[in-house]
Regions:
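An anion-binding catalytic pocket shared by soluble metabolic enzymes
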Residues: 8, 66-73, 91
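Catalytic nucleophile loop
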Residues: 86-89, 112-132
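C-terminal and late-domain segments of enzyme folds
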Residues: 1-33, 46-53, 57, 134-135, ...
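A short, aliphatic-rich alpha-helical micro-motif
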Residues: 79-80
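Short hydrophobic beta-strand segments
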Residues: 37-45
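Catalytic-core regions built around general acid/base machinery
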Residues: 101-116
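Glycine/threonine-rich flexible loop motifs
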Residues: 92-102, 168
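Conserved acidic residues
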Residues: 36, 83
Length: 245
């Protein structure tokens, strides 16, 4: 089977807590004792130095060294030598463009899918782990050469998923309506709406919903379904043609 190991987190910060505070135990369990250093990809934010400082402080507090890819003179070589990869949140379009600009799409895919290097993403970093960034919440502030992403899983994710607020007077589309519009297009893959506080752990061909909140699954042509932490989503990994059912 596929050696991939992924921890796809909806959000970096949960209300009332610090950076990655809500998932730090999951991070330690995921990386374990074999990983000594993590390669951080700060491309989703403009101030990469400040972003790297924040991430380094957190990971060092968990017992891991952190190298930021933007400090490397050869980003491709940094990926090839990495023990684990963490792509942080920010603007998904800016992030994906930088991954293409630095020729990292295929390199990261190979390291994760063939070499089994652990991959962690939060928010935008979770978006780019999927088929495409079509279901991001972000504004297209820059123009990547493609919306196709890393494809580490054969479906899409909507991080920071928000349920409709019955008391709101806002007349714009809800998140659910926007995802339904996406699924009006042919051959669009499943979309997993990850609420803040939720994350998906993928180990080989097994995927499990973790965290403190649930998720909402959208399949093309089907009514969305509600899922609690602990749900086995392995079927999403096995069958990428669920939208045709």
């Amino acid at each position: 089977g596929c050696p991939r190991r992924l921890l796809l987190v909806s959000n970096s910060t949960l209300h009332g807590g610090g950076y990655l505070g809500h998932c730090q135990q999951h991070i330690q369990s995921f990386l374990g004792g074999k990983v000594k250093r993590v390669l951080f990809v700060p491309y989703a934010l403009h101030d990469r130095d400040a972003y790297a400082r924040t991430a380094r402080e957190k990971f060092e507090s968990l017992g891991y060294g952190l190298d930021s890819i933007h400090e490397s003179c050869d980003p491709v070589e940094a990926v090839r030598k990495s023990e684990a990869i963490f792509i942080g949140g920010g603007n998904t379009f800016r992030l994906l463009k930088a991954l293409y600009d630095n020729s990292l799409i295929q390199e990261i895919r190979k390291r994760v899918l063939e070499d089994g290097v652990p991959y962690m993403g939060s928010s935008a970093g979770t978006n780019v782990a999927t088929v495409s960034i079509n279901t991001t919440n972000d504004m297209p502030i820059v123009y990547p050469p493609s919306l196709q992403a890393l494809g580490l899983v054969p479906f899409n994710i909507n991080p920071h998923y928000l349920d409709p607020d019955d008391k709101s007077t806002h007349m714009g589309e809800t998140r659910e309506e926007r995802i339904r519009q996406y699924h009006e297009e042919p051959n669009t893959p499943p979309v997993l709406g990850l609420r803040e506080g939720a994350m998906l752990l993928v180990e080989g061909d097994k995927a499990t919903l973790q965290g403190v909140t649930g998720a909402r699954l959208f399949l093309r042509g089907k009514k969305p379904t509600e899922h609690e932490p602990g749900t086995d989503f392995s079927f999403l990994l096995i069958d990428s043609n669920l939208q045709k059912l």
